[in-house]
Amino acid sequence: MDPNMNNLLKWGIQNSTATQQTSDSNNNASQAPRSNITPEMLSALFGGPSEADLMKAAMEALRSDEVDLENKLIAFDNFEQLIESIDNANNLEPLGLWTPLVELLKHEEPDMRRMAAWCIGTAVQNNEKAQDKLIVMNAIPTLVSMSTQDPVPAVRKKAVYALSSAVRNYQPGTNELVKHLPGGYASGKVDAADMDTIDMIMDKLRAHPVSSSPPSAA
């Protein structure tokens, strides 16, 4: 991926959130990135990249063999911040970004799996449209497998976060979760609005014993 585009992604996120800071913080945050803008970045900015463009550029970086892990994680962080907006989260489908995002749950690099789960959790939180899409993508079984089998604690933690966001107050998601839980967990009908029961399931997933061997490919 073009390094200028990667810098542009960082600049775009920093400036898109600057208005939410206090006046002093805003001045400090805006001055630093602007001082680092290159002519190439300005040229790209004159084209007016939208947040949809930035989302697509981030995913391009995540899928590129030419981008190292450090810059992929920067792109992932930018992507996650962008989809905190429900409008951007709902744009994942028309932009064709759900499929590659879900595929990254099975990446060989733990940090990539962790960030993919984090982004999914952000996208589906209090968002029925995205929660429904996650079921269509058949991602809940993968997230259950990650939360109970992945050898890396940080990955498991984000997988549980994604599941928690996917099922709360969304009955189809809760039904799908219960269907794929290991033995010893809640079975039968679980009310998606029963936060105590949902919390118990999530707490049990967080405490699930995991072997040292890597998860089997789904």
From Swiss-Prot:
Keywords: Cytoplasm, Repeat, Translation regulation. ARM repeats lie at residues 26-67, 86-125, 128-168. The keyword Acetylation does not apply. The keyword Repeat applies. GO terms for cellular component: cytosol; endoplasmic reticulum. InterPro entries: ARM-like (IPR011989), ARM-type_fold (IPR016024), Hsp70_NEF-Inhibitors (IPR050693), Nucleotide_exch_fac_Fes1 (IPR013918). It is found in: Cytoplasm. GO terms for molecular function: adenyl-nucleotide exchange factor activity. Pfam families: Fes1, HEAT_EZ. GO terms for biological process: cytoplasm protein quality control by the ubiquitin-proteasome system; regulation of translation. Belongs to the FES1 family. Functions as a nucleotide exchange factor (NEF) for Hsp70 chaperones which accelerates the release of ADP. Required for fully efficient Hsp70-mediated folding of proteins. PANTHER family: HSP70-BINDING PROTEIN 1, PROTEIN FOLDING REGULATOR. This is Hsp70 nucleotide exchange factor fes1. The lineage of its organism: Eukaryota, Fungi, Dikarya, Ascomycota, Pezizomycotina. The gene is fes1.
